[in-house]
UniProtKB/Swiss-Prot annotation:
Bidirectionally degrades single-stranded DNA into large acid-insoluble oligonucleotides, which are then degraded further into small acid-soluble oligonucleotides. This is Exodeoxyribonuclease 7 small subunit. The keyword Hydrolase applies. It catalyses: Exonucleolytic cleavage in either 5'- to 3'- or 3'- to 5'-direction to yield nucleoside 5'-phosphates. Belongs to the XseB family. It is an enzyme of class 3 (hydrolase). GO terms for cellular component: cytosol; exodeoxyribonuclease VII complex. It comes from the Bacteria. Pfam families: Exonuc_VII_S (PF02609). GO terms for biological process: DNA catabolic process. It comes from Rhodopseudomonas palustris (strain TIE-1).
């Protein structure tokens, strides 16, 4: 964890950031971390959460739905509504 804690959050992939965030959550839930360390890893967890949210927003923006005309020919793209 020490090596991960020194890695710049902005350089982490979504999967790596999520993995580290899950580790932090487990450590905090165990309740065996000293107070000062708890605060430090909580702050890192917040940064990791923001990183994951940013990467998800970027991925959603890249997912496009192809639009077609009456004959079925592609006319362009529009944001994909997944709901």
């Amino acid at each position: 964890m020490a090596e991960a804690a020194t890695t710049d959050v902005k350089k982490l992939s979504f999967e790596r950031a999520l993995e580290e965030l899950e580790t932090i959550v487990k450590r905090l839930e165990d309740g065996k971390v000293p107070l000062e360390e708890s605060v430090t890893i909580y702050e890192r967890g917040e940064a990791l959460k923001r990183r994951c949210e940013d990467l998800l927003r970027q991925a959603e923006a890249r997912v496009d739905k192809i639009t077609t005309d009456a004959q079925g020919a592609p006319t362009g793209t529009e944001p994909l509504d997944v709901q």
